[in-house]
Amino acid sequence: MALSQSVPFSATELLLASAIFCLVFWVLKGLRPRVPKGLKSPPEPWGWPLLGHVLTLRKNPHLALSRMSQRYGDVLQIRIGSTPVLVLSGLDTIRQALVRQGDDFKGRPDLYSSTLITDGQSLTFSPDSGPVWAARRHLAQNALNTFSIASDPASSYSCYLEEHVSKEAEALISRLQELMAGPGHFDPYNQVVVSVVNVIGAMCFGQHFPESSDEMLSLVKNTHEFVETASSGNPVDFFPILRYLPNPALQRFKAFNQRFLRFLRKTVQEHYQDFDKNSVQDIMGALFKYSKKGPRASGNLIPQEKIVNLVNDIFGAGFDTVTTAISWSLMYLVTKPEIQRKIQKELDTMIGRGRRPRLSDRPQLPYLKAFILETFRHSSFLPFTIPHSTTRDTTLNGFYIPKECCVFVNQWQVNHDPELWEDPSEFWPERFLTTDGTAINKPLSEKVMLFGMGKRRCIGEVLANWEVFLFLAILLQQLEFSVPPGVKVDLTPIYGLTMKHARCEHVQARLRFSIK
């Protein structure tokens, strides 16, 4: 009697529940696309009905999917809920998909989180991949190049980027010295992000950018509200019910995007009031020059109200990626002082202390460049590209891939693939140097994946590389970074669209020589 009272369901109810469960499972299985004769579907590990592999991914999808690839190969399929997701690993396979078959894999999945970014009109996240998208991407690329890496004949600097970074790096050094004279330590991320956002802000908006405003600082110091939800594999994109349940992370994501969009719209509007098409001095001016009023545009013109979508991608990616790269670099340097000393010896030998580093010094500083490459590889702080999708039925490595299939590209796996890298878990910049140590091993450097490949490759890749190089060269020429004895620095990546390290508020900076 006691046993029967402890059972909450009758045998009939349990049988009915099991039948419904099996019915749903087989219905979902029947929805899978038919595979043409002679082809096969990618291998798929066992997953839970209804849930798929979401429990397997957990907090570190890049690690879980890397382990799966070791067993199932470079092309495999998982399910998040009932949605099939193609997972690509291996440099050759990824290059085949994104470069050689780039038109097949250039799409973006229509994810819920993407609809919340600039009202679903983001150039980077939008599922659109047609001629209009291509034209706007080309326009954004040209505007970015013109006012960043192109030469400025009226300046003593080689380009706009060099001018802005040089000035902001000096300002950062001054701020760090003030902090050392006060509390005696600092959180590098909070300091670096201010300088980096001022650089991209100056290039985008010129004198109209509100440097160090409370609104701007509040946004850029809280990017975690964006990256934790925009990351690949977020359940909210695959389980619609989660959008209607209490979800603090999703609410923060929505609020951040709304605040960021308001900030950009206000700044764009203020800039437009003073726009002179005969005197274009920043990225916004270049975009205005190729815009027209009204909801529709033709040829190379775009509607003015769409400009904010382009500048959102340029501005947003321009500060978060570079800030994260520099912050990771400083964390490696304080935990590996011998590497820091090698970089500074190279700077002292090749540049000296009588002038500041410039972008033209890059060929003379191979060890610094190798260190940056190893930081990109080892941290892999962009573990996945933004998800891709197929634009048509296709095949890859003999497997059938249907149209509109969501695709995860595992950059972390490539950067830690033992078939590509000797001792991939070790941080070793020398791996990127030629035998005599005087130059970068170019074929090996091209195996590092951080900015994607093919038609969706990041348009700011060159800018980001140059900016990280110049910031670090100027900082390390003048400062020595360290942490006090006994302070533990946690280098465990925190998963997100861009993976951050745990915040460290105990970093110190000492002047290496008197600044003239």
Swiss-Prot record:
GO aspect biological process, one term: arachidonate metabolic process
Gene Ontology MF terms in the entry: estrogen 16-alpha-hydroxylase activity; estrogen 2-hydroxylase activity; heme binding; hydroperoxy icosatetraenoate dehydratase activity; iron ion binding; steroid 17-alpha-monooxygenase activity
Binding site for substrate: F226
Residues annotated to bind heme: C458
Cofactor: heme
Keywords: Endoplasmic reticulum, Fatty acid metabolism, Glycoprotein, Heme, Iron, Lipid metabolism, Lyase, Membrane, Metal-binding, Microsome, Monooxygenase, Oxidoreductase, Steroid metabolism, Sterol metabolism
Name assigned to this protein: Cytochrome P450 1A2
Protein source organism: Pongo abelii (Sumatran orangutan)
